[in-house]
From Swiss-Prot:
InterPro entries cross-referenced by the UniProt entry: AAA+_ATPase (IPR003593), DNA_recomb/repair_RecA (IPR013765), DNA_recomb/repair_RecA_CS (IPR020584), P-loop_NTPase (IPR027417), RecA-like_C (IPR049261), RecA-like_N (IPR049428), RecA_ATP-bd (IPR020588), RecA_C_sf (IPR023400)
Phylogenetic lineage: Bacteria, Pseudomonadati, Pseudomonadota, Gammaproteobacteria, Pasteurellales
GO biological process, one term: DNA repair
Protein function: Can catalyze the hydrolysis of ATP in the presence of single-stranded DNA, the ATP-dependent uptake of single-stranded DNA by duplex DNA, and the ATP-dependent hybridization of homologous single-stranded DNAs. It interacts with LexA causing its activation and leading to its autocatalytic cleavage.
Organism for this UniProt entry: Haemophilus ducreyi (strain 35000HP / ATCC 700724)
GO annotations of cellular component type: cytosol
Protein's UniProt name: Protein RecA
Cell membrane in keyword set: no
């Protein structure tokens, strides 16, 4: 017994030669790569993993708040909120921006409610958009998995998680209980999807609805449908709400929309952004561009006049926006300068940014107060 204790003590105190340790590690890495393929394990610093490709949301402020210039490719994103808050509008805007840079997009319409006329108005090329209207949740997720594994589709929208009804529930009778069936379906599907999404660099966006938890006395009673799996697998979660209305005289022409980044694995989370969604037009890009350009000094305002590079471009907000629409080259140049200022690069710490902090709502609130 004493000899065994002495042997254990000698083993514990024995120092491992660093050179031998490095050789052992190299051998283990080589064995893993041989068994599972090249790239199955690597040092984080040896890759460009942090330089994540992004697709613009169509909102400059939201792109800046997301930290990388939009929604990350090769990841799962969840967008949720109350009814008529702008969830589908935001995802159609993402599709329009993705198509503009040559990406192939698909829309899995589980709600059977996509309006092609509205999608076209938002800039979506509906002739190039792939659309599926599945009969049940299993079919929708199988189609999604097949599109991801093909490697030929870059952006997939699933609208919505709440409409992914399990086949057993559809074939059953009204009033039958199917406790946890949809949650199990989502959990199984996401386990299958995650690795393929990363391998094919495909962006999959799930739209989700809000439900109320019964009997919650303290804290937020709201929850999303489909169980907890999506919360864990999503790299980005956006909470979108309608915060007010946009009026032209007495007529309501749009809605003020607030988006909170509830979760973000690719940049700092918990930022909030506000922008307008105009009915029949989508996100009011030029309105947002003018606000951000003024806040960051690219456009100056003196009294009611706006000026750019010393040249007056319009008296009042509406005239300045009209000038930006009539001069798309200048608007694009200003937008690129704003993006360069506000959006983090992979090697740049967040502390080095920025004159306008998108997490600080005061700049946005002041700007929108001026509009009113």
């Amino acid at each position: 017994m004493a000899a065994d204790k002495k042997a254990q003590k000698n083993t514990a105190t024995k120092q491992i030669d660093p050179e031998q340790k490095e050789k052992a590690l190299a051998a283990a890495l080589a064995q893993i790569e041989k068994q599972f393929g090249k790239g199955s394990i690597m040092r984080l610093g040896d890759t460009q993993a942090l330089d994540i490709e992004a697709v613009s949301t169509g909102s400059i402020g939201l792109d800046a708040a997301l930290g990388i210039g939009g929604l990350p490719m090769g990841r799962i994103v969840e967008i949720y909120g109350p009814e008529s808050s702008g969830k589908t509008t935001l995802t159609l805007s993402v599709i329009a921006q993705a198509q503009r840079i040559g990406k192939t997009c698909a829309f899995i319409d589980a709600e059977h409610a996509l309006d092609p006329v509205y999608a076209r108005k938002l800039g979506v090329d509906i002739d190039a958009l792939l659309i599926s209207q599945p009969d049940n949740g299993e079919q929708a997720l199988e189609i999604c998995d097949a599109l991801v594994r093909s490697g030929a589709v870059d952006v997939i929208i699933v609208d919505s998680v709440a409409a992914l009804t399990p086949k057993a529930e559809i074939e059953g009778d009204m009033g039958d209980s199917y406790m946890g069936l949809q949650a199990r379906l989502m959990s199984q599907a996401l386990r299958k999807l995650t690795a393929n999404i990363k391998a094919t660099n495909c962006l999959v966006v799930f739209i989700n609805q809000i439900r109320m938890k019964i009997g919650v006395m303290f804290g937020n009673p709201e929850t999303t449908t489909g169980g907890n799996a999506l919360k864990f697998y999503a790299s980005v979660r956006l909470d979108i709400r309608r915060s007010g209305v946009v009026k032209d005289g007495d007529e309501v022409v749009g809605s003020e929309t607030k988006v909170k980044i509830v979760k973000n694995k690719v940049a700092p989370p918990f930022r909030e952004v506000q922008f307008d969604i105009m009915y029949g037009e989508g996100i009011a890009r030029m309105n947002e561009l003018l606000i951000l350009a003024e806040a960051n000094g690219f456009i100056q305002k003196a009294g009611a006049w706006f000026s750019y590079n010393g040249t007056k471009i319009g008296q009042g907000k509406n005239n300045a926006i009209k000038w930006l629409k009539e001069n798309p080259e200048v608007a694009e140049k200003i937008e690129q300068e704003i993006r360069n200022l506000l959006i983090l690069t992979p090697d740049q710490p967040a502390s080095e940014k920025l004159e306008l902090d998108v997490n600080d709502e005061s700049d946005f609130d002041e700007a929108f107060e001026e509009q009113e």
